Protein backbone atom coordinates (compact mmCIF):
# COMPACT_ATOMS: atom_id res chain seq x y z
CA UNK A 1 0.00 0.00 0.00
CA UNK A 2 2.80 2.41 0.90
CA UNK A 3 4.43 1.79 -2.45
CA UNK A 4 1.12 2.32 -4.23
CA UNK A 5 0.56 5.62 -2.44
CA UNK A 6 4.08 6.75 -3.20
CA UNK A 7 3.65 5.85 -6.85
CA UNK A 8 0.46 7.93 -7.01
CA UNK A 9 1.37 10.95 -4.93
CA UNK A 10 5.16 10.92 -4.89
CA UNK A 11 5.90 12.45 -8.32
CA UNK A 12 3.34 15.23 -7.83
CA UNK A 13 4.67 15.98 -4.38
CA UNK A 14 8.21 16.21 -5.70
CA UNK A 15 7.03 18.49 -8.50
CA UNK A 16 5.44 20.89 -6.03
CA UNK A 17 8.37 20.87 -3.66
CA UNK A 18 10.97 21.34 -6.35
CA UNK A 19 9.69 24.68 -7.56
CA UNK A 20 12.02 27.61 -7.06
CA UNK A 21 10.37 28.59 -3.76
CA UNK A 22 9.72 25.13 -2.45
CA UNK A 23 13.24 23.96 -3.18
CA UNK A 24 14.84 26.21 -0.56
CA UNK A 25 13.27 24.58 2.47
CA UNK A 26 13.49 21.09 1.02
CA UNK A 27 17.16 21.42 0.16
CA UNK A 28 18.06 22.86 3.56
CA UNK A 29 16.21 20.09 5.39
CA UNK A 30 17.60 17.32 3.22
CA UNK A 31 21.18 18.54 3.43
CA UNK A 32 20.97 18.94 7.21
CA UNK A 33 19.40 15.52 7.58
CA UNK A 34 21.95 13.99 5.24
CA UNK A 35 24.84 15.50 7.20
CA UNK A 36 23.47 14.09 10.46
CA UNK A 37 22.73 10.64 9.07
CA UNK A 38 26.03 10.19 7.27
CA UNK A 39 27.97 11.15 10.36
CA UNK A 40 26.46 8.27 12.33
CA UNK A 41 28.81 5.33 13.02
CA UNK A 42 28.60 2.25 10.83
CA UNK A 43 27.74 4.06 7.59
CA UNK A 44 28.95 2.53 4.34
CA UNK A 45 32.40 3.56 3.20
CA UNK A 46 31.49 5.33 -0.03
CA UNK A 47 31.52 9.04 -0.86
CA UNK A 48 28.79 11.01 0.86
CA UNK A 49 27.06 14.01 -0.70
CA UNK A 50 29.40 16.55 0.85
CA UNK A 51 32.45 14.37 0.08
CA UNK A 52 31.88 14.59 -3.68
CA UNK A 53 34.85 15.87 -5.65
CA UNK A 54 35.66 16.43 -9.30
CA UNK A 55 38.45 13.85 -9.25
CA UNK A 56 41.61 15.46 -10.56
CA UNK A 57 39.88 18.69 -11.63
CA UNK A 58 40.41 21.70 -9.32
CA UNK A 59 37.12 22.99 -7.93
CA UNK A 60 37.52 26.39 -9.58
CA UNK A 61 38.00 24.76 -13.01
CA UNK A 62 34.87 22.57 -13.02
CA UNK A 63 32.69 25.00 -14.99
CA UNK A 64 35.37 25.72 -17.58
CA UNK A 65 36.18 22.03 -18.08
CA UNK A 66 32.50 21.13 -18.38
CA UNK A 67 32.02 23.76 -21.09
CA UNK A 68 34.96 22.25 -23.01
CA UNK A 69 33.37 18.82 -22.61
CA UNK A 70 30.10 20.15 -24.04
CA UNK A 71 31.88 21.66 -27.05
CA UNK A 72 33.66 18.38 -27.86
CA UNK A 73 30.60 16.94 -29.58
CA UNK A 74 29.32 17.45 -33.12
CA UNK A 75 26.51 15.91 -35.18
CA UNK A 76 26.58 13.60 -38.19
CA UNK A 77 24.34 13.05 -41.21
CA UNK A 78 21.25 11.99 -39.25
CA UNK A 79 21.94 14.26 -36.28
CA UNK A 80 23.77 11.60 -34.30
CA UNK A 81 26.31 12.86 -31.77
CA UNK A 82 29.99 12.00 -31.97
CA UNK A 83 33.25 13.39 -30.62
CA UNK A 84 34.57 15.77 -33.27
CA UNK A 85 38.29 15.22 -32.63
CA UNK A 86 39.08 11.52 -32.19
CA UNK A 87 42.50 12.45 -30.81
CA UNK A 88 40.72 13.86 -27.77
CA UNK A 89 38.54 10.83 -27.00
CA UNK A 90 40.66 9.65 -24.09
CA UNK A 91 40.99 13.15 -22.70
CA UNK A 92 37.19 13.33 -22.82
CA UNK A 93 36.82 9.97 -21.05
CA UNK A 94 39.31 11.00 -18.37
CA UNK A 95 37.45 14.27 -17.81
CA UNK A 96 34.13 12.43 -17.67
CA UNK A 97 35.35 10.09 -14.94
CA UNK A 98 36.92 12.92 -12.99
CA UNK A 99 33.44 14.43 -13.01
CA UNK A 100 31.33 11.37 -12.19
CA UNK A 101 33.36 8.83 -10.18
CA UNK A 102 32.35 10.10 -6.74
CA UNK A 103 28.81 10.74 -7.90
CA UNK A 104 28.50 7.22 -9.28
CA UNK A 105 29.68 5.71 -6.01
CA UNK A 106 27.34 7.95 -4.03
CA UNK A 107 24.22 7.34 -6.13
CA UNK A 108 24.83 3.90 -7.68
CA UNK A 109 27.64 1.98 -5.96
CA UNK A 110 31.18 0.89 -6.80
CA UNK A 111 30.15 -1.32 -9.74
CA UNK A 112 29.97 1.02 -12.72
CA UNK A 113 27.77 -1.17 -14.89
CA UNK A 114 24.23 -2.46 -15.29
CA UNK A 115 22.81 -5.88 -14.52
CA UNK A 116 19.47 -7.59 -14.35
CA UNK A 117 17.89 -7.50 -10.89
CA UNK A 118 17.66 -11.13 -9.84
CA UNK A 119 14.87 -12.54 -7.62
CA UNK A 120 15.65 -12.29 -3.91
CA UNK A 121 18.86 -10.35 -4.47
CA UNK A 122 19.67 -6.74 -3.72
CA UNK A 123 20.94 -4.33 -6.34
CA UNK A 124 24.54 -4.81 -5.14
CA UNK A 125 24.23 -8.61 -5.03
CA UNK A 126 22.76 -8.67 -8.55
CA UNK A 127 25.69 -6.55 -9.73
CA UNK A 128 28.20 -8.97 -8.23
CA UNK A 129 26.43 -11.97 -9.77
CA UNK A 130 26.69 -10.27 -13.16
CA UNK A 131 30.41 -9.74 -12.52
CA UNK A 132 31.10 -13.25 -11.28
CA UNK A 133 29.90 -14.77 -14.56
CA UNK A 134 33.08 -13.47 -16.14
CA UNK A 135 35.17 -15.97 -14.19
CA UNK A 136 33.10 -18.78 -15.70
CA UNK A 137 33.18 -17.37 -19.23
CA UNK A 138 36.98 -17.13 -19.04
CA UNK A 139 37.46 -20.53 -17.34
CA UNK A 140 39.62 -18.94 -14.67
CA UNK A 141 41.44 -20.98 -12.03
CA UNK A 142 43.53 -20.05 -8.99
CA UNK A 143 46.91 -18.64 -9.97
CA UNK A 144 45.91 -17.59 -13.48
CA UNK A 145 46.44 -14.00 -14.61
CA UNK A 146 43.56 -11.92 -15.94
CA UNK A 147 43.22 -8.39 -17.32
CA UNK A 148 40.27 -6.11 -16.49
CA UNK A 149 40.07 -3.72 -19.44
CA UNK A 150 38.71 -0.36 -18.25
CA UNK A 151 38.48 -1.31 -14.59
CA UNK A 152 36.98 1.84 -13.06
CA UNK A 153 37.21 1.68 -9.26
CA UNK A 154 37.64 -2.07 -9.54
CA UNK A 155 34.59 -3.85 -8.19
CA UNK A 156 34.25 -6.27 -11.15
CA UNK A 157 37.96 -7.07 -10.96
CA UNK A 158 37.77 -7.71 -7.23
CA UNK A 159 34.71 -9.92 -7.67
CA UNK A 160 36.37 -11.98 -10.41
CA UNK A 161 39.55 -12.32 -8.33
CA UNK A 162 37.63 -13.31 -5.20
CA UNK A 163 35.44 -15.96 -6.85
CA UNK A 164 38.12 -17.47 -9.10
CA UNK A 165 41.40 -17.16 -7.21
CA UNK A 166 42.99 -15.56 -10.27
CA UNK A 167 45.20 -12.49 -9.99
CA UNK A 168 43.45 -9.66 -11.83
CA UNK A 169 45.23 -6.58 -13.18
CA UNK A 170 43.00 -3.63 -13.99
CA UNK A 171 43.71 -0.71 -16.29
CA UNK A 172 41.94 2.67 -16.29
CA UNK A 173 42.91 5.99 -17.79
CA UNK A 174 41.75 7.90 -14.73
CA UNK A 175 44.19 8.43 -11.86
CA UNK A 176 41.49 9.28 -9.36
CA UNK A 177 39.83 5.92 -10.00
CA UNK A 178 43.13 4.25 -9.13
CA UNK A 179 43.04 5.96 -5.73
CA UNK A 180 39.50 4.72 -5.15
CA UNK A 181 40.37 1.20 -6.34
CA UNK A 182 43.33 0.99 -3.97
CA UNK A 183 41.13 2.19 -1.12
CA UNK A 184 38.55 -0.52 -1.84
CA UNK A 185 41.31 -3.13 -2.12
CA UNK A 186 42.46 -2.33 1.41
CA UNK A 187 38.90 -2.26 2.68
CA UNK A 188 38.04 -5.67 1.21
CA UNK A 189 41.36 -7.38 1.88
CA UNK A 190 42.08 -7.97 -1.81
CA UNK A 191 45.42 -6.19 -2.06
CA UNK A 192 47.58 -8.42 -4.24
CA UNK A 193 44.62 -10.10 -5.92
CA UNK A 194 43.40 -7.04 -7.80
CA UNK A 195 46.09 -4.69 -9.10
CA UNK A 196 44.85 -1.40 -10.61
CA UNK A 197 47.10 0.31 -13.16
CA UNK A 198 46.75 3.70 -14.82
CA UNK A 199 47.04 3.65 -18.60
CA UNK A 200 45.39 3.86 -22.01
CA UNK A 201 43.75 0.57 -22.92
CA UNK A 202 44.46 1.26 -26.59
CA UNK A 203 48.18 1.45 -25.82
CA UNK A 204 48.71 -0.76 -22.78
CA UNK A 205 51.93 -0.79 -20.72
CA UNK A 206 52.04 -4.61 -20.72
CA UNK A 207 54.24 -7.07 -22.59
CA UNK A 208 52.82 -9.25 -25.34
CA UNK A 209 51.33 -12.57 -24.20
CA UNK A 210 51.20 -11.43 -20.56
CA UNK A 211 47.74 -12.64 -19.51
CA UNK A 212 45.87 -15.93 -19.49
CA UNK A 213 42.51 -14.19 -19.97
CA UNK A 214 40.90 -10.76 -20.21
CA UNK A 215 37.50 -9.15 -19.77
CA UNK A 216 35.82 -5.78 -20.18
CA UNK A 217 32.62 -4.70 -18.51
CA UNK A 218 30.76 -1.69 -19.93
CA UNK A 219 34.13 -0.07 -20.68
CA UNK A 220 35.36 -0.48 -24.26
CA UNK A 221 32.51 1.77 -25.40
CA UNK A 222 34.96 4.60 -24.59
CA UNK A 223 37.46 3.50 -27.29
CA UNK A 224 37.68 5.65 -30.45
CA UNK A 225 37.49 2.41 -32.45
CA UNK A 226 36.81 -1.03 -31.03
CA UNK A 227 39.62 -2.44 -33.17
CA UNK A 228 42.06 -0.24 -31.24
CA UNK A 229 41.27 -1.74 -27.84
CA UNK A 230 40.51 -5.25 -29.11
CA UNK A 231 43.85 -5.28 -30.91
CA UNK A 232 45.68 -4.42 -27.69
CA UNK A 233 43.82 -7.14 -25.80
CA UNK A 234 44.77 -9.60 -28.54
CA UNK A 235 48.43 -8.57 -28.20
CA UNK A 236 48.68 -9.03 -24.43
CA UNK A 237 46.72 -12.31 -24.33
CA UNK A 238 48.51 -15.64 -24.41
CA UNK A 239 47.62 -17.91 -27.35
CA UNK A 240 44.44 -19.81 -26.56
CA UNK A 241 43.31 -17.17 -24.06
CA UNK A 242 39.70 -16.01 -23.81
CA UNK A 243 38.43 -12.42 -23.91
CA UNK A 244 34.86 -11.71 -22.74
CA UNK A 245 33.20 -8.31 -22.93
CA UNK A 246 29.85 -6.72 -22.12
CA UNK A 247 29.37 -4.14 -24.87
CA UNK A 248 27.24 -1.00 -25.04
CA UNK A 249 25.76 -1.25 -28.54
CA UNK A 250 22.73 -0.43 -30.62
CA UNK A 251 20.53 -3.43 -31.37
CA UNK A 252 18.96 -4.59 -34.62
CA UNK A 253 15.89 -2.50 -33.71
CA UNK A 254 17.77 0.81 -33.80
CA UNK A 255 16.89 2.96 -36.82
CA UNK A 256 19.38 5.80 -37.49
CA UNK A 257 16.74 7.61 -39.57
CA UNK A 258 14.24 7.62 -36.69
CA UNK A 259 14.59 11.01 -34.98
CA UNK A 260 13.39 9.68 -31.62
CA UNK A 261 15.90 6.82 -31.72
CA UNK A 262 18.67 9.29 -32.51
CA UNK A 263 17.63 11.63 -29.69
CA UNK A 264 17.67 8.78 -27.16
CA UNK A 265 21.06 7.55 -28.35
CA UNK A 266 22.52 11.07 -28.37
CA UNK A 267 21.56 11.49 -24.73
CA UNK A 268 23.24 8.19 -23.85
CA UNK A 269 26.40 9.24 -25.72
CA UNK A 270 26.66 12.71 -24.16
CA UNK A 271 25.63 11.64 -20.66
CA UNK A 272 28.23 8.87 -20.53
CA UNK A 273 31.25 10.48 -22.19
CA UNK A 274 31.17 8.17 -25.22
CA UNK A 275 32.71 8.93 -28.63
CA UNK A 276 29.70 7.33 -30.39
CA UNK A 277 27.64 4.13 -30.26
CA UNK A 278 28.55 1.06 -32.29
CA UNK A 279 26.17 -1.67 -33.39
CA UNK A 280 26.40 -5.22 -32.10
CA UNK A 281 27.48 -6.32 -35.57
CA UNK A 282 30.31 -3.79 -35.66
CA UNK A 283 31.51 -5.13 -32.30
CA UNK A 284 31.56 -8.70 -33.61
CA UNK A 285 33.47 -7.65 -36.71
CA UNK A 286 35.98 -5.59 -34.73
CA UNK A 287 37.08 -8.63 -32.76
CA UNK A 288 37.39 -10.80 -35.84
CA UNK A 289 39.27 -8.05 -37.69
CA UNK A 290 42.11 -8.10 -35.14
CA UNK A 291 42.46 -11.89 -35.24
CA UNK A 292 40.08 -13.22 -32.59
CA UNK A 293 37.82 -16.19 -33.12
CA UNK A 294 34.24 -15.30 -32.14
CA UNK A 295 32.77 -17.96 -29.86
CA UNK A 296 29.65 -16.28 -28.44
CA UNK A 297 27.54 -13.25 -29.34
CA UNK A 298 24.43 -12.81 -27.24
CA UNK A 299 22.48 -9.90 -25.77
CA UNK A 300 21.98 -10.78 -22.11
CA UNK A 301 19.18 -8.21 -21.95
CA UNK A 302 17.06 -10.56 -24.09
CA UNK A 303 17.51 -13.52 -21.73
CA UNK A 304 14.29 -15.02 -20.30
CA UNK A 305 12.83 -12.52 -17.80
CA UNK A 306 13.62 -14.41 -14.60
CA UNK A 307 14.44 -11.13 -12.89
CA UNK A 308 13.89 -7.46 -13.55
CA UNK A 309 15.45 -5.84 -16.65
CA UNK A 310 18.78 -4.03 -16.44
CA UNK A 311 17.01 -0.66 -16.50
CA UNK A 312 14.74 -1.54 -13.54
CA UNK A 313 16.59 0.56 -10.95
CA UNK A 314 17.01 3.60 -13.24
CA UNK A 315 13.31 3.31 -14.07
CA UNK A 316 12.44 3.48 -10.37
CA UNK A 317 14.69 6.51 -9.98
CA UNK A 318 12.72 8.25 -12.71
CA UNK A 319 9.32 7.07 -11.51
CA UNK A 320 9.71 8.21 -7.90
CA UNK A 321 11.50 11.47 -8.59
CA UNK A 322 14.81 10.42 -7.03
CA UNK A 323 16.76 12.07 -9.82
CA UNK A 324 15.05 15.37 -9.06
CA UNK A 325 16.00 15.02 -5.40
CA UNK A 326 19.62 14.31 -6.32
CA UNK A 327 19.69 17.32 -8.63
CA UNK A 328 18.18 19.52 -5.92
CA UNK A 329 20.63 18.30 -3.28
CA UNK A 330 23.64 18.94 -5.48
CA UNK A 331 22.34 22.31 -6.68
CA UNK A 332 21.67 23.33 -3.09
CA UNK A 333 25.10 22.21 -1.91
CA UNK A 334 26.69 24.17 -4.77
CA UNK A 335 24.76 27.32 -3.89
CA UNK A 336 25.91 27.01 -0.28
CA UNK A 337 29.54 26.64 -1.35
CA UNK A 338 29.74 23.05 -0.11
CA UNK A 339 30.48 21.62 -3.57
CA UNK A 340 32.29 23.05 -6.62
CA UNK A 341 30.22 25.92 -8.01
CA UNK A 342 29.37 24.38 -11.39
CA UNK A 343 29.26 20.69 -10.46
CA UNK A 344 25.46 20.77 -10.58
CA UNK A 345 25.82 20.86 -14.37
CA UNK A 346 27.49 17.44 -14.28
CA UNK A 347 24.77 16.06 -12.02
CA UNK A 348 22.09 17.40 -14.36
CA UNK A 349 23.86 15.94 -17.40
CA UNK A 350 23.80 12.43 -15.95
CA UNK A 351 20.34 12.70 -14.37
CA UNK A 352 18.77 14.05 -17.57
CA UNK A 353 20.27 11.13 -19.49
CA UNK A 354 18.66 8.44 -17.31
CA UNK A 355 15.10 8.63 -18.74
CA UNK A 356 16.54 8.18 -22.23
CA UNK A 357 18.62 5.27 -21.02
CA UNK A 358 15.46 3.65 -19.69
CA UNK A 359 13.64 4.33 -22.97
CA UNK A 360 16.53 2.85 -24.94
CA UNK A 361 16.27 -0.34 -22.92
CA UNK A 362 12.49 -0.53 -22.85
CA UNK A 363 12.23 -0.09 -26.63
CA UNK A 364 15.13 -2.49 -27.20
CA UNK A 365 17.17 -0.15 -29.38
CA UNK A 366 20.11 -0.13 -26.95
CA UNK A 367 21.79 -2.65 -24.68
CA UNK A 368 24.71 -2.28 -22.24
CA UNK A 369 25.26 -6.02 -22.00
CA UNK A 370 25.79 -7.60 -25.38
CA UNK A 371 28.09 -10.48 -24.45
CA UNK A 372 30.94 -11.29 -26.80
CA UNK A 373 33.38 -14.10 -26.05
CA UNK A 374 36.48 -14.29 -28.21
CA UNK A 375 39.47 -16.63 -28.23
CA UNK A 376 42.99 -15.94 -29.41
CA UNK A 377 44.07 -18.80 -31.69
CA UNK A 378 46.72 -21.18 -30.36
Swiss-Prot record:
Disulphide bonds in the chain: none
Known EC number: 2.1.1.262
Instruction: Give the CDD domains listed for this entry.
Output: AdoMet_MTases
What catalytic activity does the UniProt entry give for this protein? Answer: squalene + 2 S-adenosyl-L-methionine = 3,22-dimethyl-1,2,23,24-tetradehydro-2,3,22,23-tetrahydrosqualene + 2 S-adenosyl-L-homocysteine + 2 H(+)
Ordered alphabetically, the record's keywords are:
Endoplasmic reticulum, Lipid biosynthesis, Lipid metabolism, Membrane, Methyltransferase, Microsome, S-adenosyl-L-methionine, Transferase, Transmembrane, Transmembrane helix
Q: Which domain of life is it from?
A: Eukaryota
- Example GO biological process term? steroid biosynthetic process
Top class in the EC scheme: transferase
Fetch the PROSITE patterns from UniProt. Answer: SAM_MT_ERG6_SMT
Function as written in the Swiss-Prot or TrEMBL entry: Converts squalene to mono- and dimethyl derivatives, but not to tri- and tetramethylated products. Unable to methylate cycloartenol, zymosterol or lanosterol. Produces mainly monomethylated squalene and only 20% of dimethylated squalene.
Q: What is this protein called?
A: Squalene methyltransferase 2
User: What is the protein's species of origin?
Assistant: Botryococcus braunii
